[in-house]
């Protein structure tokens, strides 16, 4: 990019050296002194879309302004403009500590200065990435010096890790050891100087105070934070222990596929730290590491004891006896060249004949291995920390592209075969993993760091709600259902008066859970017993794609292709507490359908305060109502998601379950084919009309007065998005969405999907909060199988929504950051850039989305009812409409004391309905309820 100036021309900003989701870091220099190098962190205000991001940046600025220390990256200047924040900071040309550990061998060969440093202080072994003792003790003392200063200011950093420990060039503003120490530095004067960076998570925390915010990087996070307990400044000491261990051994002391597993692994270690046999670590360092990595913070070494440790206070002057004229010369050369550490690697590789193409250049480990547990990477993370070495600028290198279809097929195959092979494609993980905690375990035996969990990439805000949801679901999954005779008998897994699912006695033989013969239940809600036994796929309800994507695709993706298959396979869940009945896809099919049909639970009190005294039946009743609401919103979000991210053909070919799903979408399901041609035509018409109508968001129904032009718009949509089942056109349908949509349409659909997913998350989180209050007030810690199944379903949907929301957020950023005119436009639908911008800027209202969708579904259900066909589909459609309209009337349902993060996200969508709107919606609810009642009376006669 071209150079530019900031602070009225005081600083010249040069080449980009790092980039993240929220910030870009450039190198530069003082205008009047080109040899005075700086780093400039630029944060666009448009990227700080919520107050948490802005707050973290302001905290970082405030803290850096107050602290000045030689081993802390200093804030030189700061400028706020109407569009950006510019933080002028110390320039650290040698990147961060991860370069020395994970790229040591390449640096030995390619970097002139570091080559000399490593020759003087050679690594202890070629079998691991551990550093020479001189590095270890020097950086330990420098880190201790910085922490001691922070403690004097009552500051806790909360994100100590190698990526936040930057390395500055030595021998630049001094020439000898004496001057080095006079300037306030500690350690060895001829080694790169360590500086703590990134105070986005730091807080002023007096020694007597406790904090409870979850933040930091999982692999370096103290167990009390992982377990979302209150913590104090000693959490930083745990992180120091992990960094010290990694400097000695080349790998973190604990690795896991997700935060919960990491906590369990730390707890199971019982304070016994295992050092690899190939690493020779002196006893003093081992003792210090073990004292730092103590599980109980009360028993963990204190700051005073740490600062007075014999290694921390060791005299290192014996490392400084030799003159280092060569080191000084190369340091001066590096300073004059103003080159960043990664550029030397690229340069040397190109000189050796390696292709200079971006997709074959040097890729740091942090880019090679995407995060495994993306479900917990919340958008509130302060990703301004492209800390001059964590993320290298895209013009310096670019990741090698991987065929997503091949990786997706590999993911399906690995799941079916029970493979332990780790898959590392971030986008496929987002697209296909509905429970991101279900990731294969890491290979701990590899000491080179190549198989380390990429949880150490950048830094992560641990989504506290996700941790709580998964932890509670694990607790209930391991509950001894068999001992609760009365609960099981009382519930008898009767899914809302559903006699076709039963538990065979004795109760300890839960693995025999299976379907009973088909029966019909009496009363006004009578219907055929099961969707499977009706010879009709649940995915026939395409108005919201509700039961096709949500149950047909998501459930089979999570649980396997059938209940029988699940019986013969081991659960792929990370949690060892899962039992097969809880992961039975058929139970989830029936559970969700019946929850929607059980419209008697539509209206619940606005504030729920449950406890064990109210009994398990009350809890189940509340959860069923909330689950139904979450599911209908989730289902509509899935429609939006499918328009942007169609499934790759390789995924469908690799999975029998998804092949079945594809036949459903192609209207060639052999089960449906058994029905009459007339019934099939009705279903096809319902599917084509409704799904095609939702694809083009520019032509949605906007108000009642716009319905006169409905047929014209619908015709346009059908012309553009043909869903006919003829020949090859049908087979290509699933891949036609995103390639046909304009960028403005993709942005609009993404925003709508995010709002819907966030609403589903809000309801699901509230469900788990209610369950948590009841569960932890229980003395017996026993629950019914019915409640257990509900909780596991809520957990699965919560994790899936979290993954997809994060993916859509990144997709949205990608399109919003694209320059106008870079995307091809359809000749049939070219519109001006101004029109595009107006369309994108249109505000998304959850209530309107649900209102319009509910009316669409009920309208087509009424048409089907008039034809006297598919009454079971009509029943499900009417019930879905009622749930959607009810949700649109709610203002943060089931609220409790304290504001939830999802409530905060959706607060702009609350209170958008005036009294007249609510009256209209109430009339529709009354009308549709009457239709549903009449329909059920009609069905009861059959």
From Swiss-Prot:
It holds the Pfam family Pkinase. This is Serine/threonine-protein kinase ATG1. Gene3D superfamilies: Phosphorylase Kinase, domain 1, Transferase(Phosphotransferase) domain 1. Belongs to the protein kinase superfamily. Ser/Thr protein kinase family. APG1/unc-51/ULK1 subfamily. It is an enzyme of class 2 (transferase). The keyword Nucleotide-binding applies. GO terms for molecular function: ATP binding; protein serine kinase activity; protein serine/threonine kinase activity. ATP binds at residues 17-25, 41. Keywords: ATP-binding, Autophagy, Cytoplasm, Kinase, Membrane, Nucleotide-binding, Protein transport, Serine/threonine-protein kinase, Transferase, Transport. Residues 515-529 have a biased composition (Low complexity). It is found in: Cytoplasm; Preautophagosomal structure membrane. Its main location: cytoplasm. SMART domains: S_TKc (SM00220). Residues 11-312 form the Protein kinase domain. It comes from the Eukaryota. GO terms for biological process: autophagosome assembly; autophagy of mitochondrion; piecemeal microautophagy of the nucleus; protein transport; regulation of autophagy; response to starvation; reticulophagy. One of its GO terms (cellular component) is phagophore assembly site membrane. The gene is ATG1. It comes from Candida glabrata (strain ATCC 2001 / BCRC 20586 / JCM 3761 / NBRC 0622 / NRRL Y-65 / CBS 138) (Yeast). PANTHER family: NON-SPECIFIC SERINE_THREONINE PROTEIN KINASE, SERINE/THREONINE-PROTEIN KINASE UNC-51-RELATED. Residues 435-452, 819-834 have a biased composition (Polar residues). The keyword Cytoplasm applies. It is a peripheral membrane protein. Residues 435-454, 505-529, 817-836 are annotated as: Disordered.
